[in-house]
């Protein structure tokens, strides 16, 4: 397996690092989530690390430079998450549900996508099941989210 893109999925962003606020939202299967954006290496590496909670209607959207196989891990992540992978067309191509927190540092396992992805959405664990998400679901972006 190629080296894990230290797109350390979930991490708690740097102050002022990621775009956030009421204008940055995504919609998935009729449910709107306020998202923080991680669109550079530093933001993707930090992700949701060191957070103790995330509001029910919030998440983090990781934007990669190109569509390719992705692998995320839970290093220093304290909350369980659903990791959802989307292609260039913003269609759901892979899901890692109910991924547990990991305190093993570099010993945390990877959670790879089953198909190439450009966008990764992290939500609180259980959201994918609650929405009954199936691959092919479309992710809609608010106008404030940057388009690569």
Can you say where each PLM-predicted feature lies in the sequence?
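Sec-dependent signal peptide recognition
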Residues: 2-9
